[in-house]
Amino acid sequence: MLVSDLVATSERVAALSRRVEKIGALAALLRRFSPAEVQIGVDWLTGRLRQGRLGLGPSVFAEARRASPSVAQPALTLGDADAVFTEIARASGPGAGGERRAALAGLFARATDLERDFFARLLAGELRQERLEPVMVDAVARAARVPPASLRRAVMLAGDAAEVVKAALLEGALGLQRFSLQLLRPVQPMLAQSADDVVTALSELRAMALEWKLDGVRVQAHKAGDEVRVFSRGLGPVTKAVPEIVEIVRALPVRSVVLDGEALAFRPDGAPHPFQVTMRRFGRAHDAAALRAELPLRALFFDVLHLDGEDLLDRPGSERTAALRQVLDRSLRVPRIELPTAAEAEAFFADALAHGHEGVIAKSLAAPYEAGRRRGTWLKVKRARTLDLVVLAAEWGTGRRRGLLSNLHIGARDPAAGGFVLLGKTFKGMNDEVLAWQTQRLLELEIGRDADTVYVRPEIVVEVAFDGLQSSPRYPGGVALRSARVKRYRPDKPAGEISTMDEVRAIHAGALAGEAAEKGQAEGGGEELEDDG
C-alpha cells in the first residue's frame, strides 16, 4: 500500500466528527492491508511506531526538509518507510546520529509534502487522532466481520494488537478463538476515566468501592509454579528491575496467579516518593541490587485476574476483590472502602491526599475486568493543581483542527532573568468556540512563524491544570508540566502577574524534598523520565 493512501485516510478520519463515519473510512482502508502491512498500518493510524522512539527532534525534521525538495507523485509504500525506521532504530555507536539524519533525509527525499508532515508528526509523537484506538477496534471488527466485543477481548488477552488484527482480518471469528489468558504473558490493563470529584463519581457508579490512587508504576505480576514475571503498563518485561516484588509473589501460597497493582518507593517518613524517583528503578541500564538497597520498592495490588487455574476476568469487581483478600495480606493491598456515603467518600479522598497520594479511583462493584477505559466502570478523582501561565506560541492543528491554532506553548514568568520560560505544550481543554477565538486573538499578537508554529507577544494568560512536574533537559527551565490542560483564559490578569519560575521550582522542589533529605550529600542527577500514565 502507498503511504499516501494511509495518510489521506488518516487526515479524513481526523476531520470527521461522526464516529460511524470514522469507522467506515478505517474499515475500508484495513481491508486493503496485506498481512505484512497490518501492524505497520494500525500502529501508524494510532500514532505509534513498532520500532519505538527514534530520538529525532524538530531540528532533524527541518534539516531533512531542507536537504531536498519533496516529490509530486507519491510512490513510497508502507514497507519502504518502515524499513527506514528500522534502519534508524538500529543505528548505534559513533556516528549513529549522522546515520539517523541521513536515513531520514533519504526518506524525505522520496516523500510528498503531506507524507513529510505525517512522518514528522508520527516520529515526534504528535500524531493525534482524537483517541482513535477505540474507534480502530470497531473498524477492525467491521472490516473482519467479527463482534467488536470479541475483538476487544482478544486484544486484551493477547497484548499484541497487531497479532489479533491480523488474525481477525485473515481468519475472522475463528482466528480470535485461540486468544486466551496465558500465564506469564501480559494482559492489557483496565484504565480509569476522569471525574471532577468524588460526589460525581458516587452518583455515576452508585454501587462502588473507592481505592487510593497511587502515583507509582503500574505492574502486572504473573506466577506459574516457581516462575514469576512482572510487566509494566506498556506490557514490557520489568522482572529484573523489581526483585523484591518477584520474591513477594513467588512466596504466595498459590500455584498460579495474575495480580494488577502499583510499585512505589517510599520515604522514611512513610510518604511516597514522586513518580520520577520511583521510575529510577526502571531505567534502561541499572544495577538492580544496588538500586534496591538505595531505593526499595513496595508493591500494592488492587486486582486479581487469575487464581489457581481459574480466570477471573469476567467476575464482578466485588468477587475479584474477595479473591484478592484471600491471597494477599492487607499490607500488600491498596486501601479500599466499599459502598461509602458522600461524607465517607470525601473523607477517604482527603485521607489519600494527606498520605501523599494522587487521589482516589471509584470502581463499580459489578464491572468485569476489561482493557482500556470503559464508561461506568472505573473513575479517577485527583487533586487539581493549577498555574497561571502565558501563551508564547501555538502550533497549527491537524485533522478537524486544521486551520486553527491548537497546541499552545505555555510558560511562566522569570523575574530574575526577565521574560518568560517555556514549561510545556497542551492542546487539551479547548472546545471549538475557544479554538476559533484563540486563533483570531493569537494571530493579532503574531511576531513570527515557521512551518508549523506561530510565535506571539506574551500577553494572553491561561489557567492551566496539571498532574505534576518533572525534570526535563528539553526545556530551558529544566522543568516540564505533566498532563497539562487549559482550564480557562484569564483576561483579568496581566502577564506581569502570572506564576513565576520560583513558584514552579518550589512546587517541584517540594515534591523532591524527601529524597534530598534522605540522601543528604549523595550524588544527584537523574535522567528525564515520563509518566507511564
Swiss-Prot record:
Annotated catalytic residues: 213 (n6-amp-lysine intermediate)
Residues the entry annotates as binding ATP: 211, 218, 233, 262, 302, 374, 380
UniProt cross-references to InterPro entries, sorted A to Z: ATP-dep_DNA_ligase, DNA_ligae_ATP-dep_bac/arc, DNA_ligase_ATP-dep, DNA_ligase_ATP-dep_C, DNA_ligase_ATP-dep_cent, DNA_ligase_ATP-dep_CS, DNA_ligase_ATP-dep_N, DNA_ligase_N_sf
GO process terms (BP): cell division; DNA biosynthetic process; DNA recombination; DNA repair; DNA replication
Cofactor (UniProt): Mg(2+)
UniProt keyword annotations, A-Z: ATP-binding, Cell cycle, Cell division, DNA damage, DNA recombination, DNA repair, DNA replication, Ligase, Magnesium, Metal-binding, Nucleotide-binding
Molecular function GO terms recorded: ATP binding; DNA binding; DNA ligase (ATP) activity; metal ion binding
Job description of the protein: DNA ligase that seals nicks in double-stranded DNA during DNA replication, DNA recombination and DNA repair.
UniProt family annotation: Belongs to the ATP-dependent DNA ligase family.
UniProt-recorded name of the protein: Probable DNA ligase
